């Protein structure tokens, strides 16, 4: 059953956006690899002092395996000034008639 993954990264949002621009090809390559390992949806969102990922994966195990073995993500995190390890939460999607 798919899971929604929320990841919180303490980071300077402007610095992160700069890395998105300078390493766009790396972001695209990581996304392509993620799709082969079970990623269904992905996006970044930001708030004051933090960047979040909102993903949907085939399973929590698929996400954890991908994230722990992906060599480019730690480089991007370091260049983005991420402070400390990210925090991940996993949620089960609920079926309801108002989903869109």
Describe the role of every protein-language-model region.
Residues 1-71, 82-100:
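Short S/T/G/P-rich N-terminal loop/turn motif that feeds into the first structured element of a domain
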Residues 74-78:
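Helix-adjacent hinge/juxtasegments
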């Amino acid at each position: 059953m798919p899971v929604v993954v929320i990841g919180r990264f303490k980071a300077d949002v402007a610095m992160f956006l700069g890395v998105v621009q300078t390493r766009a090809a790396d972001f695209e390559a990581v996304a392509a690899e993620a799709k082969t390992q079970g990623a269904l949806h992905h996006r970044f969102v930001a708030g004051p002092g933090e960047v979040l990922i909102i993903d949907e994966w085939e399973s929590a195990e698929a996400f954890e395996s991908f994230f722990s073995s992906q060599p480019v993500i730690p480089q991007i995190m370091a260049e983005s000034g991420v402070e400390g390890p990210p925090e991940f939460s996993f949620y089960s999607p609920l079926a309801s008639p108002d989903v869109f």
